[in-house]
Amino acid sequence: MAVVAVFPALARMLAVSRRRLVSPSLSMTSCRRCYRGDSPTDSQKDMIEIPLPPWQERTDESIETKRARLLYESRKRGMLENCILLSLFAKEHLQHMTEKQLNLYDRLINEPSNDWDIYYWATEAKPAPEIFENEVMTLLRDFAKNKNKEQRLRAPDLEYLFEKPH
């Protein structure tokens, strides 16, 4: 009773919440969410497409600089799924890749404008465009299958970069 006197707005809000619990028809109409693209008549004319500069192979880069850049770019993707997948893939494969494979990997992770595309191609949820169907994509898909059932919850620590080769 004292709450009603001190906080009348809170009391009204709680009363409405109780009515929603009692009356399903009220809660259905007031809780419906609409997301962009739900409407079949949405023309998406209000969408702004920002053109990205086309990917260009860096021919003036040493192979060690390229490896370091690709390691960084594999770790800093902007979406956690690809950060984990690509950073672990880079840890396992980057040091053993030929220059040709490094160029293919560079193109794969830097040419597509949407990181989800890379993730869907690697997990085989969607087919990759012909230009990306190559030996590096095969390696990435095989890695994404996680045949050894490793626990992959985060990007690897960087200590492995400073370990002495065995």
UniProtKB/Swiss-Prot annotation:
Question: Which GO biological-process labels does this protein carry?
Answer: mitochondrial electron transport, succinate to ubiquinone; mitochondrial respiratory chain complex II assembly; protein-FAD linkage; tricarboxylic acid cycle
Q: Which InterPro entries match?
A: SDH (IPR005631), SDH_sf (IPR036714), SDHAF2 (IPR028882)
- Protein localization: Mitochondrion matrix
Q: Which UniProt keywords apply?
A: Chaperone, Mitochondrion, Transit peptide
Q: What is its main location?
A: mitochondrion
Entry-linked Pfam families = Sdh5
GO CC, alphabetical: mitochondrial matrix; mitochondrion
Where are the disulfide bridges?
A: none
- Where is the transit peptide, renumbered to this chain? 1-29
Protein family membership: Belongs to the SDHAF2 family.
Summarize the subunit comment: Interacts with SDHA within the SDH catalytic dimer.
Q: What does this protein do?
A: Plays an essential role in the assembly of succinate dehydrogenase (SDH), an enzyme complex (also referred to as respiratory complex II) that is a component of both the tricarboxylic acid (TCA) cycle and the mitochondrial electron transport chain, and which couples the oxidation of succinate to fumarate with the reduction of ubiquinone (coenzyme Q) to ubiquinol. Required for flavinylation (covalent attachment of FAD) of the flavoprotein subunit SDHA of the SDH catalytic dimer.
Name listed for the protein in its UniProt record: Succinate dehydrogenase assembly factor 2, mitochondrial
Q: Which gene encodes it?
A: SDHAF2
